[in-house]
Amino acid sequence: MGTVRCGMKKTRSNIRDDSDQEFIMELKRKNDTDSLYLEKCHAADGSEVPLLKYPLLEKTGLVEHCFSTRMGGVSEGIFSSMNLSFTRGDDKEAVETNFHRIAEAMGVPFEKMVFTDQTHTTCVRKVTGADAGKGVLRERDYRDVDGLITDEAGLVLCAFFADCVPLYFVDPVHRAIGLSHSGWRGTVNRMGEKTVQALKDAYGTRPEDLICAIGPSICVDCYEVSADVADAFGTAFPGREKEILRDKGNGKYQLDLWRANELILSDAGVRPEHIATTNLCTCCNDRYLFSHRASHGKRGNLGAFLMLRP
């Protein structure tokens, strides 16, 4: 695992050292792959907003996307500074400002954001322009939705994280997208596969056409689980337990959610070369990324965002 001393610079290159920038992010990477990079963006007031992006998704030319960091917002204390949760005790106006900054930095319409309602399900909802603003400007009229899909340009899919796995889906043939939240419960119940199926049912998506990304989340070295969780994964991944579980010999296991989600997407028909997997762990990088485990629950939320370009 290497540490990259990363200045935020608007660049299409990999995470790199730009020490002349205004502040430095020392991101610890689990490997040297170039799956994602940090881009320095700006809100309308000129404030810097660093966003993590995937070259594989950008190469489609069809989407705006990002994964947020803790930096660039106005929240304080344990929520400092880019907290994207209205429900964890932060000041509502601060959170609204943070969402405005994200939208401005991405160049997407704030009023077209659509939120999940995450409860560790595998429910995927098809959203349209009629859903614009739900979660951020008005109440959602749906519950227990951990994944969103759409084929409407300009609608910003939004999901939220602090160790769980973000899953991005782009169908360049049918011009459709999906964004899902997959913690250990979602993963053991194959949320990635459920999202692929939802795209197939709604838009005729062929799995082999999909371009996918597995976003920043907790790594195998940081994610210790109990025997009952390990048993559930053993049942869900028969014959492949050793690819995703490390037995510590004390009734505890280290769980690899990244590899598990790679297997799920591959099993669903996504080509391995069409899957970009994060090399950033939220728990290893809790100074810059919110982590439930590292903070013992005293934290805000990160956000994943995905929009079809008009």
Q: What is each stretch, according to the model?
A:
Residues 2-310:
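Active-site microenvironment for binding and transforming phosphate-containing groups
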